[in-house]
Structures are given as structure tokens and as C-alpha cells.
Amino acid sequence: RLLNTADAQGAAQALALDAALTWTAVQVQAAPAVEVNGALDVRTLQASVVAAQMAGALSSVFQRSLQYANERQQFGRPIGKFQAIQHQLAVMSEHVFAARMAAQLGCSAGHDGMGVVPDRLRVATAKARCSEAALVVSELAHAIHGAIGFTEEYDLQLFTRRLHAWRQTAGSEAYWYGVAGEALLHHQGMTLDIVRRITDVDTVL
């Protein structure tokens, strides 16, 4: 069932970043049901959702870093005017948009008339790429922000800490690259066919 997080009751957790969410039995029964293929791998479904979350967080981290670089003054001008910072932002941009495209492919895995059925290979690509980007983007974001990015009062750490947690959720990039590699080893045709299977979709969300 599709449960609205806005309707949930939240409770703080001692060892987790996010609150524990609970719904009443009435809310659960009233929530719309989505029919899912019985053979669906739950980890694959979870990974597709987490990849989308990561893509959004990566974009937010990049936008915050870009804004900070344009506002922070050093030596009489914004630090974003320095070539070293521009290079870091360019690298971040590459990873952020690559992760976004991969997550879109993972979420557009298809519908067979029986419910949501993610394509495992597309999801593997999405989760692996987003997890890989999380390391690079988080590191560069904190490098650009300096010490302020590590403080509890500054919002950057709310995103980067979750990116590191989500990187391991439903399998890290090492796990999903292994899934993709296994699919490639068992494929009997051309490698290009695998690439087409991942990237050729009718509509990218």
C-alpha cells in the first residue's frame, strides 16, 4: 500500500537520522493498494526508491554548494570565481546529473499490467551510480563549504549524512555492480544489447 508520510506519526530514534514513522490501522486500510508481481525482488524495489531519494539529495547538495560558492567572499571576491572551486563544482555537476539520469532509468523500469515491476539491471545501474556519486559529491561539498558544513546548525550535513546512509541501503555500489557484471557474464549476445536494454526506454520520467 502507498502510505502518505505526511499522515504518519513521527517519533525520534536514538541511533537513526530519521524519525520512526507509524500509521494507524485505519490509515493503512484506507491507503491505495498497488498490485506487485509476486516474483518481485523486494531489494530491487527498495533500491529503485532509494536511488531516487539519493538523486534528489545530490541535487540539493550541489545547489547549496553552488549558492555558497557565489555568496562566500574571500580575498575580495566570491570563492566561486576561483578556478579550483569551479573545477570542484564542475565535477559535482557531472556526478549529480549522471546520477539523476540513472535514477530516472531505474524508476522507469516498466509496467507489465500486473503492477510495478522494476527491471533489475536498470535498478542496479541506478543504485550503483547514485551510491558512487554520493561519495564524490559529499566530499566536494564539504571541501567547498569548509568547517561550517560540518556543524550541526548548518543543513548540509543533513543531506550528506543521509547520502552516506542511503549508499549502503539496499546494497552498496559494489553489490549492484556485481549484479550488473553477473548479467553481462550470462548474456549470450553483444554487450551493446545490454546497454540498449538499460538505456532504451519509451519515456524517461
Segments and roles (model prediction):
Residues 1-63, 67, 191-205:
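FAD-binding core of flavoproteins
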